[in-house]
């Protein structure tokens, strides 16, 4: 036994660095073996990393769970009540909008059914012409025709020529061309055109000024200061692209001659390029409704409506009494009409007299025009609200029409409802099934509004759904302009002259899409963003909701994208 024990005790490796079985069986003090230390350290790190990963996973899960709970709480306690409140607000606004349109439509229909034409309500006998030529000419009142223009190279000949061809004694007519052009070549062309008509015996006055202060209002105000204007009893106004028929004055001036309380005769616009593209067809539908329903109703109800800025004839005395042309807003025409209306003067709209004009053919021109037409009235309403309420020469009902119907319902509530309901609330409803919209608000009211608008242009009734989607997009632009005007932001008084392309024969020769039309100039981020939001809502509704609401959302998103990339209208080089 001793021998075997001795042999076992003396079984020691000769190499001190080698590892024996006992090294693994018995604990070895730390640091006695580098290899052992490395393996032990790696194991510790692995265990520690695994523990850290489990800890991170638990932490992330806890954070996600808390975020989900927070989102559910925010959703149920904040967003859902807000959206339900928005639904109620839109219900009220939709009723207001529909009631206003039904009211105007009924008035317009009654006027037509009862044949209450202006010629039957007002005396408008032709101006008496005596046998003697000199006496006959003297019986015609002196009329001034004002044509303000700014770099109107494509159309200046149209308006000047049409004004000079008006059937009226030459010695009783003054054509005043107010040229604010900054292009020397255009200025020279306009001057020579005036000289050409002057040589034909027409009394044409070519007027310029040093600067463009006040834009169109400043130009008209400067023209009214000329000495020869004081001898004129009536003032007809034409924008550079308007072409009145030869008998324009023969049909309009008698209303003012025989009715001393009338201040303004407004005629209807007719569009020479309505069939040029889809954009002009959409505009024609809106403008026809404006003239046939809104202007007709305003004229019949309380002898007041917004002056359209052109194709109208004013009593010069009224312009002076009302304070002349003001440039405090971009709606100088509406400004003058309001001030004249508050003095008790009456207006008449004569829809049977049509004046040819041009619709904006490019989306850029149309957007700038709509900005001006939305921004100006909003600022004007802000400036004149208390003045309207304090007016003593108008009745309570006329004040109500001026404030509620003319401004609040038609220009503020209608614009806000159209954009917010169809482009914000409806797509958000897809993600919030808890929010319910009544069927009558969702379908019946929009359908009624569409049908009421279709009466303006019966020939385009097949485009009424497309017009509805188009107007929803333009409501975004109008709402933005309305807010800018009301709060007098940076572009509140921005005046950009609407680009005109001339008559249809010239338009046919224009290249529709030019190579130098840069992509960034056709890129409108806000429309594209909302279009993307609507497209996302449409996809979500198709995948997760059991309805066909995605059809409307998809259709509306397509129109947003079409306008966002300027795929409507004519594209021309600048």
Curated annotation (Swiss-Prot):
Leader sequence residues: none
Pfam families: Glyco_trans_2_3 (PF13632)
Catalytic activity: GDP-mannose + (glucomannan)n = GDP + (glucomannan)n+1
Main location class: Golgi
Subcellular location: Golgi apparatus membrane
Primary role: Probable mannan synthase which consists of a 4-beta-mannosyltransferase activity on mannan using GDP-mannose. The beta-1,4-mannan product is the backbone for galactomannan synthesis by galactomannan galactosyltransferase. Galactomannan is a noncellulosic polysaccharides of plant cell wall.
GO terms assigned for molecular function: glucomannan 4-beta-mannosyltransferase activity; mannan synthase activity
Gene: CSLA6
InterPro entries registered for this protein in UniProt: Glyco_trans_2-like, Nucleotide-diphossugar_trans
EC number(s) reported in the record: 2.4.1.32
Keywords carried by this UniProt record: Cell wall biogenesis/degradation, Glycosyltransferase, Golgi apparatus, Membrane, Transferase, Transmembrane, Transmembrane helix
Binding site for substrate: 239, 241
UniProt record similarity statement: Belongs to the glycosyltransferase 2 family. Plant cellulose synthase-like A subfamily.
Gene Ontology BP, a term: cell wall organization
GO cellular component: a single term: Golgi apparatus
Its membrane topology: Multi-pass membrane protein
Transmembrane segments: 87-107, 412-432, 437-457, 523-543, 548-568
UniProt-annotated catalytic positions: 180, 333
UniProt-recorded name of the protein: Probable glucomannan 4-beta-mannosyltransferase 6
